[in-house]
């Protein structure tokens, strides 16, 4: 009889973000016993912890859907299946013996399976913080690195710093509620979708957004953590002082695969190299999908991750049961094994 902290599964999924959840759905459709491990204490990954209100535009059949709503829909999709979740736990150990993959979590849970899928996004993540004098006095009061409630910014003066998709997307989203938005970027060129940048330029013509380029943050002023002004400078020594109630800084994430680095997988710039057909890593039986997976021609889209999840799970099925699955359309509830 197994100890209560020792479990068996057909497949273990590391990561409970959108791609991990869709992998859970695929496992359920194949009637595979599935366990999920995630370091966060809730389901949803970055979608719920970093940008729940952020609009997503590239999910088929949804012209626009917020990150939080997408997770809610995925949770409903996997609800019929008896999935076991180990939340608030990190995978700290992995060993393979006779084709059995055994992982150990930080909560001393042991899970044995024949297949494992890593859907860990960018891994453990930390925001790239601002390096400014006295920044700690303002952080989590009037300086933030993510947005969880856009209503906080109603009729407020907001400075948004950054030149990527996150900065642009939040400028567009908050332009409907903020009094004014100052978009600060150190370069004149932005790293974002051209359509989104064109929308920003239209808002600038109407005065809802002021594009402060090429400038970078230099100094914050205020009292008791309440921001009053943001000083910005350019490379020619020019300065501007921006009145501000809030500052949002979107300079990306510092990602870390954590203990996964020690598994012996081949990695490339904090991502895991996989076979582009099966999404299997350099260790048989271990697969990687979503943003954490790397292969030639990779597109870092949620949609791509969904397709990778379906393919990887089909190969997990073959490994677990020793035969190819009998594919049926997803209109059939619970795909037969063959």
UniProtKB/Swiss-Prot annotation:
Catalytic activities = 2 reduced [2Fe-2S]-[ferredoxin] + NADP(+) + H(+) = 2 oxidized [2Fe-2S]-[ferredoxin] + NADPH
Q: Which GO terms describe its molecular function?
A: ferredoxin-NADP+ reductase activity; flavin adenine dinucleotide binding; NADP binding
Q: Which HAMAP family match?
A: FENR2
The protein, known as: Ferredoxin--NADP reductase
What high-level taxonomic lineage is stated for the organism? Bacteria, Pseudomonadati, Pseudomonadota, Alphaproteobacteria, Rickettsiales
What cofactor does its activity depend on?
A: FAD
| InterPro entries in UniProt | FAD/NAD-bd_sf, FAD/NAD-binding_dom, Fd--NADP_Rdtase_type_2, Ferredoxin-NADP_redctase_2
Which source organism does the UniProt entry give?
Orientia tsutsugamushi (strain Boryong)
EC number, as in UniProt: 1.18.1.2
**Assembly, per entry:** Homodimer.
Pfam families of this UniProt entry? Answer: Pyr_redox_2
Alphabetically sorted, this entry's keywords are:
FAD, Flavoprotein, NADP, Oxidoreductase
Q: Which family does it belong to?
A: Belongs to the ferredoxin--NADP reductase type 2 family.
Q: Where does FAD bind?
A: 38, 46, 51, 91, 125, 291, 331
Task: Copy out the cofactor comment.
Answer: Binds 1 FAD per subunit.
What cystine pairs are annotated?
none
The protein's superkingdom reads Bacteria
């Amino acid at each position: 009889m197994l100890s209560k902290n020792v479990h068996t599964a057909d497949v273990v999924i590391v990561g409970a973000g959108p791609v991990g959840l869709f992998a859970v759905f695929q496992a359920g459709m194949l009637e595979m016993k599935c366990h999920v491990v995630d370091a966060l204490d809730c389901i949803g990954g970055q979608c719920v912890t970093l940008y729940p209100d952020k609009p997503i535009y590239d999910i088929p059949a949804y012209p626009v859907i917020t990150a939080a709503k997408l997770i809610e829909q995925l949770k409903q999709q996997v609800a019929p299946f008896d999935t076991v979740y180990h939340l608030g736990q990190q995978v700290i150990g992995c060993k393979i013996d006779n084709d059995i993959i055994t992982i150990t979590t930080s909560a001393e849970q042991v899970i044995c399976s024949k297949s494992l899928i890593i859907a860990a996004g960018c891994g453990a993540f930390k925001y790239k913080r601002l390096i400014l004098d006295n920044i700690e006095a303002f952080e989590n009061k009037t300086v933030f690195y993510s947005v969880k409630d856009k209503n906080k910014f109603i009729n407020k003066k907001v400075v948004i710093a950054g030149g990527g998709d996150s900065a642009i997307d939040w400028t567009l989203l908050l332009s409907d509620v903020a009094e004014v938005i100052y978009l600060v970027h150190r370069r004149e060129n932005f790293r974002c979708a051209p359509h989104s940048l064109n929308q920003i330029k239209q808002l600038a013509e109407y005065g809802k957004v002021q594009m402060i380029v090429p400038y970078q943050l230099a100094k914050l002023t205020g009292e008791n953590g309440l921001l009053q002004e943001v000083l910005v400078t350019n490379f020619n020594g020019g300065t501007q002082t921006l009145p501000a109630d809030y500052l949002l800084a979107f300079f990306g994430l510092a990602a870390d695969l954590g203990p996964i680095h020690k598994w012996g997988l081949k990695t490339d710039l904090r991502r895991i190299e996989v076979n582009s057909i099966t999404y299997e890593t350099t260790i048989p039986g271990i697969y990687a999908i979503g943003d954490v997976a790397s292969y030639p021609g990779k597109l870092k889209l949620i949609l791509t991750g969904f397709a990778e999840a379906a393919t990887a799970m089909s190969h997990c099925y073959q490994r677990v049961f020793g035969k190819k699955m009998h594919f049926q359309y997803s209109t059939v509830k619970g795909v037969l094994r063959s």
